[in-house]
Every structure is written in structure tokens, then in C-alpha cells.
Amino acid sequence: MSESVRTNTSIWSKGMLSVIVAQFLSAFGDNALLFATLALLKAQFYPDWSQPVLQMVFVGAYILFAPFVGQMADSFAKGRVMMVANGLKLAGAAGICLGVNPFVGYTLVGIGAAAYSPAKYGILGELTTGDKLVKANGLMEASTIAAILLGSVAGGVLADWHVIAALVACALAYAGAVAANLFIPKLVAARPGQSWRLSAMTRSFFSACVVLWRNGETRFSLVGTGLFWGAGVTLRFLLVLWVPVALGITDNATPTYLNAMVAVGIVVGAGAAAKLVTLETVSRCMPAGILIGVVVAIFSLQHALLPAYALLLLIGMLGGFFVVPLNALLQERGKKSVGAGNAIAVQNLGENSAMLLMLGLYSLAVLVGVPAVAIGIGFGVLFALAIAALWIWQRRQASY
């Protein structure tokens, strides 16, 4: 990386474009690798309950390193942190290609992802400012959604052709992300010289957790976003199990196409939320959250591809409308209390803890032999009830 300071704050500067390209390739690799590795587990005759466990080891890395990755991003040049993180992802993907246990390789990818997250968001504010920062965040989210769509589909389609070829493609995507990171200017570390004592770092992180949890609005946001992303990742794995049972389709590509419909819907729903919901009217998003659970239950009863696509598109639209206002609320209130970086780190911990819990319950249901359709119906009903309870709780808190 070349030594430089921020002189060009345009969202089309070389540094900003390098960040966006690196983010696209890294997110593409993440999504393609998930479905390629799931195909590998199927090819090697791992039991069905092992599929969500794969994601659990990834999420576990996020939780384990949550107190430390924020400080790491602030203590070094963020472009360099991103490069090292993508290097860890590359090592994990390459290891799986070379026969390393897929759970071990995927854990390494999870460690890289945990380190990558705060750096990729934090660097935007160092490369641009003001209104351009909003546009830069928009570019980041657009590249991420595009990577989710293309990566998920590519992982499934390539795995149907050749599993190892799919895994190699993932490793190449991570290598491209590392190369893109080389073109990010080396910026001054935001907060160098901080204490690296584990006790001090952990204490600082959990004090931020306490501050956010004691505030009614941020607590409401943390619970809502945690439930949403926990449900979202569980739905991903439910689709892999549900498609052969409900639709009679046994390829690796169809679940990725269905997942892509959810991502498209999220984009539409997020756009609607931006126009219809403000920080003062966040509660408008709650009916959409309840409807997510209702539609998931209806979806689980389908036996044809076309209505399945339509219902997943609707689930994504409801999800985007639900989660975007909650994210904005946490970022705004968190910035004023513990700082934006700490707020994101705490949110990551909450979301990944919810993912771990929901994936654990899903794995248990599969292990004891609950049918995929029954899991989907129960999952949808429980999610709708959980969001309804959260809404009632929030209204009572607001009335005090």
C-alpha cells in the first residue's frame, strides 16, 4: 500500500473504488463459499444437522473476537486490516480446497470476517466526508447485495458442475479482494497506542454493551435486528433442507436462486423504508416484522417453484422494511452514547448470538427428525410471536 493521506474525498477516488471492489469480491467469496462448502458436506455424506453447524462455527468466531476487532481496526491503517482479514479468508478457502476439514477452514474464514467487518465500515469515514459519506455507504450496500446475489448463485451452480472448482473460485475471489486492498491508500490509524491488555479491552467493550442495553431505544433495536438476522440465516439453511422435500429438486443451485429472491426483496423493502419511515416513526416497521413470520409459515406449505419465488420475494421486502429503520435508530443513538464503532461491534455481537441460538435450535430440530415443512411452520409462527411481543414491550416502554 502506498503512503498517502486523504486528499481526494470523492466517492469515485481510487481508494474508495478499491474499497468497493474489495468488498464486492470478499462478500462474493463469503456467499459462494457457504453454498460450495454445503455441497462438499453433501458430497462427503455429512448428516443434515451438520449444515447449520458449519455456520455456527463461523458465527462463533464473530462472537469470540467481538471485544477485540473494533480496537484492531482503529489501531492500524484500516486498509491493511482489511487486507490481513481477506488473507485469512483466502487461507481458509484454500485449506478447504486442499482437503483441510471444512469446519476448520470455515472457522478461519469466520475469524477473517470478524476482523474485516469494523474496518470496512470505518474506512468510509476516513476516505470521504459529509453527504458523500451517505453515498459511499449506499455504494457499499449496493456492492454487498450484488455480491450476495451473484455469489450465492455462483456457489450453487458451480458446485453442481464441480465442487472443487466452486471452492477454487471462492479462493480466487478472496485473492482478488487482497489485491484490491493493495490499492487503498495507507491512512493514519484512528486511535493508535491503545492498551492491548485483554482485560481492559473486554471491560471497555462490555461497558458499551451495558450502556446500549440500558437505553430503551437501542435495546429495542438490538433485539429487533438480532431476531431478524438470526431468522435470516436460519431460513438460508432451511431452504437447503426444504427444497428436496417440498419441491422434489435435489440440485445445489435451486436453494441459491431462492435465497437470491430474498436479497432482491430486501433491496426493495429497504428503499420503501427510506421513504416511509423516520427515526420518529420507527414503530411503523413492526407490522412488517410480524408478517415475515406469517409469510414464512405460508411459504413452508408450498409445493411449486413459482409461488415459492413470489413468497420469498415478499419475505425479503418485509425484511428490508423491518430492519433498515432499526439499524438507523441504533446507529444514530449509539453514535451519541458509545460511538458508532462500538455500537456496530455490540450490534454484531447481538446479531451473531441470535444466529448461534437459532441455528442451534434448528440443528436440534433436524437432529431429532422434525420434518422440514414442520420446522418452517413452527419457525414462522415463533418469529411472528417474538416480534409481536417485542412491539408490545416497546409500546409499554414508550408510555412510561
Curated annotation (Swiss-Prot):
It comes from Salmonella enteritidis PT4 (strain P125109). InterPro entries: LysoPLipid__transptr_LplT (IPR023727), MFS (IPR011701), MFS_trans_sf (IPR036259). One of its GO terms (cellular component) is plasma membrane. This is Lysophospholipid transporter LplT. Catalyzes the facilitated diffusion of 2-acyl-glycero-3-phosphoethanolamine (2-acyl-GPE) into the cell. Keywords: Cell inner membrane, Cell membrane, Lipid transport, Membrane, Transmembrane, Transmembrane helix, Transport. The keyword Mitochondrion does not apply. The keyword Transmembrane helix applies.
